[in-house]
Structure formats: C-alpha cells, structure tokens
Amino acid sequence: MPAFDYRQAEEVREALSRHHVRYLFIGKSGAILLGFPDTTQDADLFVDRTPENGLALVFALRELGFSLTEDQAREIESGKDFVQLKNGPFDVDLVFAPDGIERFADAWQRRVEIQGFPVCHLDDIIASKEAANRQKDRESLPRLRAFREYWLRNRPS
C-alpha cells in the first residue's frame, strides 16, 4: 500500500465534514499535517464515541469507498476502542479511545485547525505515542519531541 497522502487527507476531511462526523487526525498522520517531515501508510483518526457520530462515520466511510462488513459497521457505530480498515482506497485506523488521552472533548478543546483539518495538538499526539509504548512509537518519539520544539516556535498563532 502506498503512503497516505495529502489528497487522501482532503477526501477524508470532505466526506467526514459532509456527514458531520466529529473526529481529529491523530498519530503520525496528524503530526504530518502539522508539518512533521515523515510518511505514513494510513490515516489515524480519533473519533468522538457517540452512536450518532459512529453511524455518520459509517456513511462517510462507505461514501469514500470502504467496503465495510456488518461487523465492522457495528464496531464503528458502537465505538469499539480500535478499528483497523484495510478494505478501502487507503488504510485507516479508527481510534475511539487512544492511549494517553482522557476524553475526546479534552482533545477537541486543544485541537489545531490547519487548512481545515482538525488535528490533535502535538502534545496529545506525543502523549498517545508515549502511553502506547510500541516499539515503532518509541523510535519516532525523539524526532517528534524535537519537531515539537520547532513547531511551538514557528506555528502560526
């Protein structure tokens, strides 16, 4: 699967916006939208866990071309902690309960809007990777922390 790209991020933003889905880009895809120089194979989305939001997300994903099974649709509608989708035009990880972030509402308050993309604050992205403590996250954390210093100094106010 090729790297997730900006055009695909735009497609996600537009479809989820049409269906009024409350979500944030998180993980490496979120960091990349903030300017982090890297690539990723998928979009990571932190989704507000409500039945209405889950149902809207199912409609948006189908519109994007994802072939959701009934089980996947049910998991999304119910807000299962983590749902990985590899049956669409690109890969998506749906995270309803990311490690290191207490509540969606808190992350929403701290979010960064960049070119219309709702993105988790870089501090939340880092906290989530620290809490997940996966090998690939431990490897990327030093670069993310270094980027954080640059980003805080140079981001538009």
Predicted regions and their residues:
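Compositionally biased terminal segments of proteins
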Residues: M1-S157
